[in-house]
Amino acid sequence: MKRENVSRIFSKIPTLTTERFILRRISIDDSDDMYEYAQNKEVTKFLTWSPHENKGHTFEYLTYLQTRYASGEFFDWAIVCKESGKMIGTCGFTRFDYKNDCAEVGYVLNPQYHGQGIMTEVVGRVIRFGFENLALNRIECRFIEGNIASRRVMEKNGMQFEGVLRGGMLIKGEYKDIGVCAILKKDFSKKE
């Protein structure tokens, strides 16, 4: 996997689909839908970022993302319900280790849609894209200890729990323990 190939693919981010969702480029038009969950303290409790203070904050963030897409430096999709057209979260690659053909997946979902298997479905599609289109060997997800629902999404997608990085990340001024789950291409192929 080469940085240039990933940048080329994501500068014109492909649209992906699942049974219930469309995964597409995040747009400035998603501002209201994103703000709906991004301002929620419960949503950001297990994330590295703080709640958006107002709709202007969300709009500025989405404007910034457009420049990152254009330069091939942003690797997230908007999760859009096929039925309603509503954007309900994001999912994508948060970092790449190009030398070792490894990437990390991250995600966030509007809490109104929790408990419906949405992230399991969406993360599964992103994992498939990583192995089939980006030639990855390993895909991992990290979660703040205590985020049981997120770990469950990972395990339902065939990821194995590999351990905890004690004090592994400074988040909002506090060192947090970070759980790591991962799947290898060979294990994904067996699962299929």
Question: Which ranges hold each PLM region?
Answer:
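Acyl-donor (CoA/ACP) binding surface of acyl/acetyltransferases
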Residues: 1-45, 76, 80-192
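Conserved GNAT-fold acetyl-CoA-binding loop/helix
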Residues: 42-64
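Short, surface-exposed helix-loop/turn micro-motifs enriched in polar/charged residues
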Residues: 49-50, 71, 101
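A short helix-loop-beta-strand connector motif used in the catalytic cores of GNAT acetyltransferases and
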Residues: 64-78
